[in-house]
Amino acid sequence: IADNYYGTFNRLCRENGITFTAQAVGNALCIVSDPIKAKSRVDKPQGEFWPIHPDGNYDIKESSSAAHVYGKNIASAEAYTDAKYSHSIADLKTLADYAYAYGINELVICASAYQPWLDKTPGNTGGGRHYCINRNNTWWDYSTPFWEFQARCAYMMRKGTPSIDLCVYLGENAPVKILTHRLPDIPGGFDFDAFTTDALITRMSSKNNKIHLPNDMSYSMMILPRN
């Protein structure tokens, strides 16, 4: 899937001068594939986060890990999926803070921008979901500083070289995902990237008691899964 599907799309996009982004391979545990390797085959690896999962799980950590391990400057995320009209800008900021802490530096807003009616509110949503980020929201006219702040955060997050303490090998047992019950206990105050066999073979080397990547990143420790 990583090479023949996403790799083929990447090649075709490059041949035509197109930037390729994809939520490779998505969140579903039924997809038997390597998400880190699949995300490495796109220009901008993308995950997603929802308000119902405020700690930033889903696959945004996989997206930032793929960006770090494979030397990509942008780790993208579908942001605020299914945010409700009851969510305030303060709620959205908290969600964005989690995403930035997980290494995301581009927010692709999940919204319902298409609002053809002038006399209907809340207007066009989507498939029974709120998708509240549109001009019919009561705080919309006051939100410009918030979006400018998010743009500035994303810009600053792309500068410099990420400093990550640990790298965690996800193994090869399906599903190859960042699953909390499989992860070792990460000490408080330390951050990690996840990687899989492809990166171990093609991207990593050992020198001076550290694990190095070609893009000048390094890790102080490699952690293996419990299984």
Feature map (PLM): residue ranges:
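Carbohydrate-binding surfaces of carbohydrate-active enzymes
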Residues: 1-227
